Amino acid sequence: MEDPEFADFWQLLGYHDVITPEIQRMALAAEVFWPCEIYYHAPADVRDGMIHALLSTEDFSEASNLMCCLAFQGDNRALEILLELERSPRPWRKRLYVDPSSYAQIGGWTFDKKGQKIQLNFDTCYPMVKGTTGEKSPVRIGRPREDTCPHCGGRMVDMLVLDGRDERLRFLGLDGVLTAACCPSCVGFLKGPAFNRFTLDGGVEVFPSELFDGAEKTDCYVRPEDYKALTENPFVLGKTPVPLFYGAACQDVNTIGGFANWVQDAEYTACPHCGKPMKYLAQIQWDTVFDCAEGTLYVEFCPDCHIVSMQHQQT
């Protein structure tokens, strides 16, 4: 991201949304397959060029990059090719860690065993911006709770409270309130994500969780002044949408919808009730809500089961 070429690319994509077919054709001709986001919704001729390269290569690293690019292109033909490679693996598959269906997730979608496409993100994105004192917002980050964490004894927090009835949030398909509650100290030390069930009237049922090391108790690393900063932060929902990749390359941007800035790999949680992959909803950068915090909290949800997952990533 420090290279000027990367900075220019992310300025064009994240803030101006102007990666054109001409740029995509030039990238393909130069065999530039990273960053893979450059091929988002590329035209059919570019897609076919990537498919030809993918089906011709014997190099696992090149195949990995090309599958990422094809995932961001994301049309039905891209799905057909990734499904074909999942069902009939090439020799280079043995050198990769995950199947083509997991590569598809990088582009915000995947497919099931029957080849049915599953959309994992939304085609609308809103930023969280700093508001004025007392400004009302349909989205709140960091609402205090009365209950305490069973692991560290610290205060639980509603990390995200979102009212889907606001006109800006209609794209989410939520006719009520979604609440995502967790322990801000322990969420990064759990064996898997934190989960809760939500009801559209604002209710929350926090699911049991386990620490990654199997211990029952741990220290609370969030200080009282951190809780205060978190629960009194000034963020409100922005008034207008932004490009889908607005938050995908910045470490200081909180967003609803669009694409995430995954610190590690894109990771879509399976719903603990129905088993389907959850949809990406929001990202909260910890250091935007209290000092000296690291990493990002990713919020996903299952629209059918009304279950939320919260997972932490950091370098």
Where are each of the predicted segments found?
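Preference for intrinsically disordered or flexible, low-complexity segments
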Residues: 1-315
